[in-house]
Swiss-Prot record:
Gene3D superfamilies: P-loop containing nucleotide triphosphate hydrolases, Translation factors, Translation initiation factor IF- 2, domain 3
SUPFAM superfamilies: Initiation factor IF2/eIF5b, domain 3, P-loop containing nucleoside triphosphate hydrolases, Translation proteins
Protein species of origin: Methanococcus aeolicus (strain ATCC BAA-1280 / DSM 17508 / OCM 812 / Nankai-3)
Residues covered by region (G5): 200-202
Source species, domain of life: Archaea
Gene this protein is translated from: infB
Residue span of region G2: 37-41
Protein name: Probable translation initiation factor IF-2
Span of domain tr-type G: 3-223
NCBIfam families: aIF-2, PRK04004.1, PRK14845.1, small_GTP
Amino acid sequence: MALRCPIVSVLGHVDHGKTSLLDKIRKTRVTQREAGGITQHIGASEIPIDIIKKISKDLIKMLGANLTIPGILVIDTPGHAAFTSLRKRGGALADIAVLIVDINEGFMPQTIEALNILKQNKTPFVVAANKIDRLPGWSSVDGAFITNFNEQKQHPNALTEFEIKLYENVIAPLAERGFEADLFSRVKDVSKTINIVPISAMTGEGIPDLLVMISGLAQRFMEQNLKLNVEGYAKGTVLEVKEERGLGKTMDAIIYDGVAKRGDYIVIGNPDGIVVSRIKALLKPKALDEMRDPRDKFKTMNEISAATGLKISAPDLDNIIAGSPLRIVPKNMVEQAKAEIVEEIEETAIQLDEEGIIIKADTLGSLEALATELRKVGAKIKKAEVGDVSKKDVIEASSYAQTNPLNGAIILFNSKLLADAKSEVEKYEIKTFEGDIIYKLVEDYEEWTKEMKELLKSDEFNRLTKPAILRIIPGCIFNKTKPAICGVEVVYGTLRVGCSVVDEQGKRLGTVKEIKDKKQENIKEAKVGMEVPISIDGTVILGRHIGEDDIMYVELPEPEVRILSHNYMGELRGDEREAFERYVELKRKLENNPFWGI
């Protein structure tokens, strides 16, 4: 059975050389315009195996490799955002990835992000340790690294510096994250150890080694996945929809299996439903030397086989979302394709909660990745959509926050707040998190959640009735009733204005309306040991219902007793706990219910 090209994605931190590497790969041997040269697809570059064999012949001979794949298809858009956007059933579209790391700088936030995404998707990868040309004393060449890595070609100090940087900035950070890795020439078992290929995207050093490693690993471990269904219909993923001069609305896509034919029907899975449209044209870019007119950039194809990038001209392509699954089928298979796509969408659909936050992302794949990471930290998700944040989203978030303030948040990955939403965010005090690094967004959200919980806990605790036991001081009954005014000692706990007080039989005496200090000024609370005059509004008559030296308890509602008991015993002072325990003991005795307050 024929094999297709493995699909390769390049990930890594900003400025570590992703684009430079792709540019260098694309330029390899292109200037010679030889037969079988690198083909520029829509959104991808195909490097035929003949080119790889030619530029890497010495290395292939040294390794004894027998490469049978037709080549490799490198996704042109680098970075983890593109990687997460390009999905297929069962995971990432890319068969293998290149994680690029600046050997001089080491791991940075987006490196960690990329590694997390690869781990989550179980995508095999090689590490390209870039910028070796910047190592002190390193003599870089345009060719294989392995033949340049010796004492005949390099100064001993440069070799020592290389080993130090390789270990400290690449091997050790990978080990910290659970990956065994080593220089590719030292790896004995590629199924257990990550291959590190030193490269220079500037000089071209190590590019042959990298291409051979990618090809060899893909062929060895993914042969089953690379078997091409040459007779079958095409399966793919939407890259983007855009306007093309002379063509109108077109769609760029990556096809990873089967054959697409002109006149077939394209079936696309969209969050709003299945879109079906008949293909007017299958387009591929013309080679540079074929472009007589800049407006005439494409050539029409009758059929195109996987793996490939292509442009599709068809009606009704509005509102198609990047990352959406697609099928290209003859008319009699449209219903089957629709059913397949519905099943695929249901498999990957984000499970929403009854209450929670709103998340937004630029593509379906990004949205899935964001939701997955948020779930790991216990986030509840009420709404998950592709696109920017509108005024309607903010108003919805404010309504969610009414149920629980922790729901008043919107997380935006590669999305933005629309103009009409910005003022609403301020008006409704909705917390927003914006960024292009998922793990950083999740960390920030987690930190905010922690702070909010502490704040809410503090607010709830402060709203709860504080336990207290009071004694009426002899000679300090100043007014017997309406209001009853007397001096009390706070024996245990904290007495607050607004609480109800009961006697030792549990009978309510009234509500504490005022507490005064020694200067006869109103205060909000009195703590243990304080002697203060208080006024009680209620039916109590001092001297008849209760008298000097008698004990009063602050009345604690049973629901509040449960909350205090379960959540806040550690927040109570020792004397407050004493007041609480004595009151609960009294209530259980009076109610003849040992489970009161539990």
